[in-house]
Amino acid sequence: MSAIKITNVAVLHNPAPFVSPFQFEISYECLNSLKDDLEWKLIYVGSAEDETYDQLLESVLVGPVNVGNYRFVFQADPPDPSKIQEEDIIGVTVLLLTCSYMGQEFLRVGYYVNNDYEDEQLKEEPPTKVLIDKVQRNILSDKPRVTKFPIDFHPEEEQTAATAAPPEQSDEQQPNVNGEAQVLPDQSVEPKPEES
């Protein structure tokens, strides 16, 4: 069972100009206290054919996380258009929101993003060079692709248990018993910037 349960991800200020920051309101529940931080990342896929054009827009650390409900707004700068091939700016691409614990990714939310001119005349007769300040992005927030990966949220417990006592020789399967946790009231968490 996962120690973190994502309860909601809301895309804020959508649609928006291509050059405006991304904002996501993320709500989640922590079912077991975690000693380390959660790492949230936002990645813009610059080209479907070549991942070298992917841009890490922001990475923040949140934590340590105690049992309870949390909500925060994750803001990231827009992608750098100079790092995207001209022919890939207009059209559909993907935005990835990921969450990791101790270097292990356990959640990936993928959104399709449609970048196009808002002006009908520019849509019909696009200029040879993209006018980035006229491009609008629309995140298709109603159809995210959510992928969950099983990870070990408490590897230190297994390591301690393995070194503390040798395993008993038995043909019976030992039950896995977890202690009860106290639920804390809704808490607001400020993300802290990742240290370089």
Swiss-Prot record:
Cellular component aspect of the GO annotation: cytoplasm; nucleolus; nucleus; rDNA protrusion
- GO biological process annotations for this chain's record? cell division; chromatin organization; double-strand break repair via homologous recombination; mitotic cell size control checkpoint signaling; regulation of cell size; trichome branching
The main place the protein resides is nucleus
According to the lineage, what is the superkingdom?
A: Eukaryota
Bias class Basic and acidic residues marks the residues at 146-157
Keywords carried by this UniProt record: Chaperone, Chromatin regulator, Nucleus, Transcription, Transcription regulation
Q: Where in the cell is it found?
A: Nucleus; Nucleus, Nucleolus
Tissues where this protein is expressed: Expressed in leaves and flower buds.
Q: How does it assemble?
A: Interacts with histone H3 and histone H4. Component of the HIRA complex made of UBN1, UBN2, ASF1A, CABIN1 and HIRA. Interacts with HIRA.
Function summary: Histone chaperone that facilitates histone deposition and histone exchange and removal during nucleosome assembly and disassembly. While encoded by a region of the Arabidopsis thaliana genome that is homologous to the Brassica S-locus for self incompatibility, this protein may not play the same role in Arabidopsis thaliana.
What PANTHER family does the record tag this protein with? ANTI-SILENCING PROTEIN 1, HISTONE CHAPERONE ASF1A-RELATED
**Identification of the protein by name:** Probable histone chaperone ASF1A
Per the UniProt record, the source organism is Arabidopsis thaliana
